[in-house]
Structure formats: structure tokens, C-alpha cells
């Protein structure tokens, strides 16, 4: 018999917000006596943008901006209906993107 697993993938620009959200989810799942693996830090996605500071010439004068997307993975092994209900009730901040795979 295969074990059922729920994978929760969190993404955010701010790692402190992401870690606080992951902690809330883990606490909610542990209250229902389900096994939790994580939060597992995944590689940070880094996007670099290079822009000319001058509108016409001076190609040597450039400015660089970077966007970091931090990610975490939480696995819930053998969830119960009570676990799923507690996950639905967890209040997460607006800056965190959540993907759930069953």
C-alpha cells in the first residue's frame, strides 16, 4: 500500500516572511499528529537585470538590479482529513505563494 503524501511548495521574495509561513504550516500539521518533513530550503532563483543609466550614450554607465525568489518545500506524510482542515484554516501573509500537490 502506497503512502499518501502532500507536498507544499512556498515561494516569496522575503525569506523572513517565508520562514514564518513555513513555521505556521508545520505547527498546524503537527497539532493533527501527521508526520512532517521540512521545511526544506530549495535553491534561490536569482534574476539579474542590467540597465543603462543614461538614456542615449555612455554605455559604460550601467546599473544592475536583482530579484531573488526564495523557496521552501514541506512534505506531509499520511495526512488525515483533520490535517487538511487545519491547513485550510492557516492564515498566510499576502507575499507568500503556495502550491499544493497531492
Curated annotation (Swiss-Prot):
Q: Name one Pfam family in it.
A: Ribosomal_S10
* Gene Ontology terms describing biological process: translation
What the entry lists under InterPro entries is as follows: Ribosomal_uS10 (IPR001848), Ribosomal_uS10_CS (IPR018268), Ribosomal_uS10_dom (IPR027486), Ribosomal_uS10_dom_sf (IPR036838)
Q: Does the keyword Ribonucleoprotein apply?
A: yes
Which PROSITE patterns does the entry link to? RIBOSOMAL_S10
Molecular functions per Gene Ontology: structural constituent of ribosome; tRNA binding
What SUPFAM superfamilies is this protein classified in? Ribosomal protein S10 (SSF54999)
Q: Which Gene3D superfamilies match?
A: Ribosomal protein S10 domain
Q: Which GO terms describe its cellular component?
A: ribonucleoprotein complex; ribosome
Keywords attached to this entry: Ribonucleoprotein, Ribosomal protein
Q: Give the protein's biological function.
A: Involved in the binding of tRNA to the ribosomes.
Complexes and interactors? Part of the 30S ribosomal subunit.
**What protein family is recorded?**
Belongs to the universal ribosomal protein uS10 family.
NCBIfam families hit by this protein: PRK00596.1, rpsJ_bact
What protein does this entry describe? Small ribosomal subunit protein uS10
Instruction: Please give the organism.
Output: Kosmotoga olearia (strain ATCC BAA-1733 / DSM 21960 / TBF 19.5.1)
The gene it comes from is rpsJ
